Amino acid sequence: MSLYARQYGFPGAVMTAALQSHGELLPTTEAGIAEVNALEAFNETMPPADVPTEHFLHAGCYVRTCRIAAGVLLTSALIKVPTVVIISGDVVVRTDGESHRVTGYTVLRGMAGRKVAYHALQDTTITMVYATRNAVPEDCEPEFTDEYKHLLTRRK
């Protein structure tokens, strides 16, 4: 078990009733953002993981997909627009001091103002979708986050 898994309670997480019944990723509190930022800092001390990421526009929607291998910890940017989040796999979502295990195929309403961490227990695909008027995928990144310069699609 990794250090971050022990420290942040990833193992043994359960999909809480709130996430399961409401199907929402709520806005993250300041304390929750600080926790995910700490996970980001920890992640930066580790060898970089390969997280294939693709994005495109279709039918007025921006679609962004990350493929996370089992064992990989991925932290999200602070998302400033409401989105749909589609998860397929087995992953623990860490937000606001709570861990939620999501297995199989799940569609969630992602609220604006959220920043979460994902720890893949099995290979997992996460897709984010939101409506936009932009015509180029790269123009959507600053629209959905102020942290766009740190996104996987911006890394060289």
Give the predicted meaning of each segment.
Residues 54, 65, 75, 83, ...:
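Short, surface-exposed charged micro-motifs
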Residues 59-79:
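Conserved short histidine dyad/triad with adjacent acidic residue
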Residues 69-71, 105, 111-113, 121-123:
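Tight coil/turn sites that cap or link beta-strands
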Residues 79-96:
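Glycine- and acidic-residue-biased ligand/ion/polar-headgroup-sensing regions
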Residues 92-115:
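Short acidic-glycine-tyrosine-enriched beta hairpin
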Residues 121-156:
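Double-stranded beta-helix
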